[in-house]
């Protein structure tokens, strides 16, 4: 893709250990969905995709011109924002597959995702004003899209709270916490819920991830999504801290095993 004129290219982040634990499977599902829904969609629309910390390449001319200069805990996200502010973007190559190792335990996952949210919040503080200024002053849709993406921690909190309220109404039906259920008929809500339940598995199956374990993984995936609520709150609270906690990688796997995934 560099020969086609692209300056920064992110590859497809796959998993080399999706079935080692419920955490590694949930991570894998999240990245499979992101590859198709976030990365491929933005590439098709001409927007900027996002760097993922591994499996990407950058033209040396870009580094020579704008430098690296990323200092927050999510330097991949920060450099993506820097590229967009300099009228560049990240492209996506779905055929360049990287088999990344996912965390095995919830503690490892907590530490890594908290670091992501610390860095994400730090990036939002640094780059939101600049991105919105560029978006409205220059009618730059890429900058606007990146600015909206930096609200991700807030979205995680809102999504988590919505799940809490929904489950609370199931347990305590006589005590309604919100009345959004009255906005549509029960039939419409049934369709919305059905689409939400089927959308993720269909996206993964569309990418030819045919395995009953993956389908079963979608039953625990909502719980993984819910854990983003406390992780995000902790990350926002400690956004000013710069401590890097390394995520251990110990999984040995042969190329033959990878080809069977």
Which functions belong to the PLM regions below?
Residues 149-165, 194-197:
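Core segments of transmembrane alpha-helices
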Residues 79-80, 109:
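Short, hydrophobic alpha-helical packing/hinge segments within bilobed ligand-binding/sensory domains
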């Amino acid at each position: 893709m560099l020969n086609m004129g692209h300056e920064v290219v992110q590859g497809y982040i796959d998993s080399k250990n999706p079935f080692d634990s419920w955490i590694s499977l949930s991570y894998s599902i999240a990245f499979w969905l992101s590859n198709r829904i976030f990365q491929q969609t933005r590439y098709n629309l001409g927007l900027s995709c996002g760097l993922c910390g591994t499996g990407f390449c950058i033209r040396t001319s870009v580094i020579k011109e704008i430098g690296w200069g990323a200092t927050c805990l999510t330097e991949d996200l920060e450099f993506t924002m820097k590229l967009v502010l300099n009228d560049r973007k990240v492209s996506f190559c779905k055929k360049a597959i990287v088999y990344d190792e996912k965390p095995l335990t919830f503690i490892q996952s907590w530490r890594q995702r908290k670091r992501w949210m610390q860095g994400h919040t730090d990036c939002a503080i640094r780059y939101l004003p600049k991105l919105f200024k560029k978006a409205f002053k220059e009618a730059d849709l890429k900058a606007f899209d990146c600015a909206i993406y930096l609200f991700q921690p807030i979205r995680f909190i809102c999504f988590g709270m919505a799940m809490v309220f929904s489950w609370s109404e199931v347990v305590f039906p006589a005590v309604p916490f919100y009345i959004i259920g009255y906005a549509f008929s029960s039939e419409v809500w049934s369709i919305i819920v059905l689409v939400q339940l089927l959308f993720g598995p269909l996206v993964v199956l569309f990418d030819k991830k045919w395995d009953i374990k993956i389908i079963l993984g979608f039953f625990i995936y909502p719980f993984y999504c819910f854990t983003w609520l406390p992780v995000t709150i902790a990350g926002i609270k400690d956004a000013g801290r710069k401590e890097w906690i390394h995520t251990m990688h110990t999984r040995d796997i042969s190329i033959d095993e990878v080809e069977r995934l």
